[in-house]
């Protein structure tokens, strides 16, 4: 999975990894970047299949075939939520077949076709300080506006 993330980053995609082998703070940062639009690709294990409530996930790509129907449903359930639409893609090699529980799928061959990455709408700035350090959101916004030449509208969420 990390290999896939590194490849996507080398191809100029804003990708983050999310898996159980990561430290909790790194998982939280990856999710924050994905939720806030600072990264538009989240490469994950089944850890993301349950319990994540992220709106507007438009695409799910299954790189490894799910072991069973329940896993497929939970993985795919991250898209098309709240009456929105979503797309599910399954990458299979020449020797693999799509399991019956997935049903009929349209076939699409890439054949070396290059997809240009879409730049994220935002960039994450991590400041490892907070209330304990007597640093609040207003201070951060003021600093970014005064020293960075930004307006309040240029600054997204401050968490």
Mark where each language-model region is.
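Conserved nucleotide-binding/hydrolysis micro-motifs of P-loop NTPases
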Residues: 1, 22-24, 47-50, 65-69, ...
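Helicase motor core with emphasis on the C-terminal RecA-like subdomain
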Residues: 1-49, 56
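A short beta-strand element within the Helicase C-terminal
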Residues: 50-65, 87-91
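Short hinge/gating elements
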Residues: 58, 86-90, 123-131
């Amino acid at each position: 999975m990390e290999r896939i993330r590194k490849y996507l980053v080398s191809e100029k995609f804003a990708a983050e990894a999310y898996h159980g082998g990561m430290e909790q703070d790194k998982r939280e940062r990856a999710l924050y970047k994905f939720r806030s639009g600072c990264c538009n690709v989240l490469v994950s294990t089944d850890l993301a299949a349950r319990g994540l409530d992220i709106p507007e996930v438009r695409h799910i790509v299954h790189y490894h075939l799910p072991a069973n129907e329940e896993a497929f449903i939970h993985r795919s359930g991250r898209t098309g939520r709240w009456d929105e639409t979503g797309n599910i893609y399954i990458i299979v090699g020449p020797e693999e077949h799509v399991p019956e529980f997935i049903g009929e799928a349209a076939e699409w061959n890439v054949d070396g076709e290059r997809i240009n990455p879409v730049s994220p709408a935002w960039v994450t700035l991590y400041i490892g300080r907070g209330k304990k350090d007597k640093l609040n959101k207003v201070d951060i916004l003021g600093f970014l506006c005064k020293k960075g030449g930004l307006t309040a509208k240029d600054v997204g969420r401050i968490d």
